[in-house]
Amino acid sequence: MGSDALAPHFDRVVLIFNPDRAGMGTRIASLEQELLAALPDLTVETLPTAFAGHARDLARSAATTGSPLLISISGDGGYNEVVNGVMDASSTRAVCTVLPAGNANDHFRSMPLRQLTEAIREGSVRRMDLLRITLTGERGQRVQYAHSYIGFGLTPLMAIGIEKGGKGKILELLSVTRTLSSLKPFELERADGATAQFDSLVLANISRMAKYGTVSEKNNPNDGQFEVVTLPHSGRWRIALMTLRAVTLGLGRQPSVSSYAFTTRNPIPCQIDGEVVHVPANTHVLVESAKHALTTI
């Protein structure tokens, strides 16, 4: 295959992005120019989002035809929408990847780095696991996928605090400090009827999270397993020590499972990648590893 040949795996590249993000117009124009210069036979489509959740609709529509490479230029939340859009398509040959343009980009940090044009030219793809969360309660059932992590308690409260407090290292640090001071434990009921109180519960498909540091020694998001990082209810100093250890030494090896289930005893916030959702009391929560569910480069 010649250096300018387009690998047959993709019939087009689709760029999905938020046009209102600062500098995005210039970045998309530059990216499109770079792709076409390296791969002149490539068809590039640009799909700007118009509202929250729109990326999911755009990805679903694009994934239903042909063999597209969907590139989300976003943070973890934007990429989550694209991934869920692809999973909404009943049968698809779509391939996904992300270019960082957000606050966390935990998924991008945890994936091997390769030149985008080189990856497209080679056409080499790989399968990765997703986390599938099923919430069942009085309002019915909701199913959603996560590419990186699902967090309860501390993780979503940090996200809410940062959103209110503003972006930037100093503002984020102040927001996290305020969050710790107002953190309340949550209670879960396991399948055997036993209950437990936690300050934090993270189910991780990746080894690193921006606000936690290294949560696991393992970084193998294609083995049908995910890591369970728990912090039972304790004093604030325990939370501070856990956070300090995560950002310095790492939390070490964590238990790996293929599924994790419980019922909420009280309302709790939940963060699915970058999106915060509020889970009502008496909701049955089932998180499973969807092995090799997503094709990526």
Locations of the language-model features?
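Gly/Ser/Thr-rich active-site loops/lids in small-molecule metabolic enzymes
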Residues: 164-173, 212-238
